[in-house]
Amino acid sequence: MPVQHGRERRHLTSHRRSAPSRSQRSQRFRVRSVTDLDLRPSILLALWLPVPSSRGAAVVEGADGAHTVLDPALDGETPLMEWMTLMGRPGRVAAVLPSPSDPLPGLGSALDAGEAVLVQTAGESSALSAFRRTCLLVPEASGTSGVWRVVDQTTQSGEPAAAVPPFDAAHARAQVHAAMEEAIEALTELDLARERPELADDLTDLITAVADPRLLPPGLDQRRRELLERSLRLLGICEIALDDDGAA
């Protein structure tokens, strides 16, 4: 399950006011608490869509209320588990984390939420469509629960406006490693530790943090899990740097 996001160095230095804080995201679409690493709703849904089950829907929904899906292919809102069943096993799926600095082609509708799930069906048709479908699921707040708004990504020519790229684990690991080095370099340049002495402890805790295994689907490949955790640590470093309005 790839996680696509813009270059983290730019996130650290250029877009503090336009990027939502961790507390703002939590208020807008709060679904769970995790042991250590923060798995956003879109990341959890992308992990569980290939193995649709009541357990997966429950993990995504958390304890704050049922989730529904607002899909133009259906009438009204559909319970998340029912939509997952109708959608069937996807051919490709990716959590995307667009930012104003790097919105990702075709995914502008996810900018406000800062996250979404890009899904491509496996076959030529499904219960929701008579043809191969590519769509974007964008999380939105709805009282104490959540709604996933489906945005079709198929253009008039029949081609997807945004396609899920093939997953290359080796390339992804190299990208995460390079981005981590950039993030640490940016933190050093910003010299945040001088004004925030607790930062070193926060970073130490984050570097050793792991994902709550109860939130992950069974059978998740160990190397993919490790890559996911490295990506989440990188994301967490960027969020720590952005917590202080004056830091960047």
Q: Over which residues does each language-model region extend?
A:
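N-terminal intrinsically disordered, low-complexity regulatory tails that precede a folded domain
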Residues: H5, R17, R22-A127
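Extreme N-terminal basic, low-complexity initiation segments
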Residues: M1-L12
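Terminal low-complexity, poorly structured segments
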Residues: E8, S18, L199-D202
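Hydrophobic, Leu/Ile/Phe/Ala-enriched alpha-helical segments that form helix-helix packing faces
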Residues: M84-M87, A183, L187, C238
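Alpha-helical oligomerization segments
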Residues: E189-A248
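Internal, hydrophobic cores of structured domains that mediate oligomerization or house catalytic pockets
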Residues: P90-A186
